[in-house]
Amino acid sequence: EMLFGRLGEKKIYVDMIVQSTGKDNQASISFTVLKKDLPEVLAICEILRKEWKASEVTAKEDIAIVSAVGVGMMSSYGVAGRMFKVLSQHGVNIEMISTSEIGISCVIDAMYAELAVKAIHKEFLEN
């Protein structure tokens, strides 16, 4: 709440958010922001890291978000599996996943964006 409250006050748009707990019950949070906002986001995160005595703040810049979108998609069986399989078959590692009723979005390495879009398009629109 504190982190995203501060980002909201600065009018920084946060898209995908993933929280996980690793070894020793340490929480980790990952989220995507616009590249133009990254320096300000890192500054806010670093302030909070010190307050919370957290271990580190890292950022990855060269990412892309690819999505498969369609009404009622999540109620259709196998959509996520098909998308993940086709990305895997093309050597594309998925770093984050977000789902909604109308779509699935994946964060991937930016260098695979065009390949991923073509592969997803072929899987869902040409098959």
Set out the residue ranges of the language-model regions.
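A conserved regulatory-domain signal marking ACT and ACT-like small-molecule sensing domains
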Residues: 1-127
